[in-house]
């Protein structure tokens, strides 16, 4: 179906089209010229009238023209980004289209050859029934899922994760808000956020206790105490003289004893006291995540499963320590497997980090940022893919975001976020980024190696419940009122 004709001057990258049919941004079109077919993407729609243009300054004249009703001539124009030749190779057009070139909607067959040849389905092209299937192998080059709040990030993560598990993929979600832990995702494997201190580094333990490196004396005391505790305990392990349940019960006393031993020569008693306070405060708040009986975290990750770690009850520092600990263990274990084969994590893992602007902030040096950066640089070689999720892209470390070769970007309105995403992306153009604010909820731009061409997609709706779904306030108020009244009736019964 012809929707319009090329007008004015054009380039091999872009053409202006005078429309005779209504279309919207995100539709794919085909231009046939120079004995070739070229695929284009509508990136902008404008409308106007030659009678009522920008040069008109007389309000009374506008009112008189308005009274003419349907007689006012109106035009619609589209800006079309020329993507590639439909020649099998998807090569760039050699020549621009000439004025008068007909423009039609691309057929499902033309679009399917480009967008439906991947491994797993993620949704459909906007304005068509053409499946969009992404290339799973390309996820080792990492993925960013970015959007404004409420635009469909969680739905996208749920759909992507569940589809990956169906092809025996292993996904690990660090569930910041508890959205997936009690969801209806198939192949769910919930993992308790337990940490065995014997597997921690002194830096990770210090972060858990909120002792920063710039608190030099406190940091030194804790490092020495924890290192001494680890060495002594691991020596006992070799000799079989360790009872793990006793370690759980006595950890507080054992580590405080070590603090006392290593700080005897410290002149500032207040630093020692502060370390003791930090340890006691941490163990009072988070004793449930410290468990000497907990096995290696890597052993809990299952293949063909959506593995979920619920972090919703923890604060940012505890989350940082846990996430960084898991990232370190996963990368190290995959390296061991690649080098020695028979040990380490035996299958690739895709790791999902939510609230990336917090854990991978450009303004703070978190432990998670260090290990996520390592995975962004090295993970591809060892089968560890990173998927970062955020509603504040401008807050993410640019070195990490720029290494997310693939991006799924849902509705985004904030100009500074769009500008930052454009600056940190090699495969995004300004016209596509500008169109992000026009997307509806659940619609996304997909770019990178996971698709052959930029795809404007309606992401599939996750068929199930997510704990993070918006509450129905009216229904919850009504239910609470009924329960209160029912309880009052019981209390008043027999009076």
Curated annotation (Swiss-Prot):
Protein origin, superkingdom: Archaea
Induction context: Part of the nurA-rad50-mre11-herA operon, these genes are cotranscribed.
UniProt effect for mutating residue 380 to A: Strong decrease in ATPase and helicase activities
Residues given in the record as ATP binding sites: 141, 150-155, 458-459
Key words, A-Z: ATP-binding, DNA damage, DNA repair, DNA-binding, Helicase, Hydrolase, Isomerase, Nucleotide-binding
EC number of the protein: 5.6.2.3, 5.6.2.4
MF-aspect GO terms: ATP binding; ATP hydrolysis activity; helicase activity
Gene Ontology biological process terms, A to Z: DNA repair
Activity modulation comment: ATPase activity is slightly stimulated by either circular single- or double-stranded (ds)DNA with a weak preference for dsDNA. Helicase activity is stimulated by Mre11.
Task performed by this protein: Involved in DNA double-strand break (DSB) repair. Probably acts with NurA to stimulate resection of the 5' strand and produce the long 3' single-strand that is required for RadA loading. Has DNA-dependent ATPase activity and bidirectional DNA helicase activity. Loads on either a 3' or a 5' DNA tail for subsequent DNA unwinding. Can also unwind blunt-ended dsDNA, Holliday junction and splayed-arm DNA.
Similarity annotation: Belongs to the HerA family.
Protein name: DNA double-strand break repair helicase HerA
Organism: Sulfurisphaera tokodaii (strain DSM 16993 / JCM 10545 / NBRC 100140 / 7)
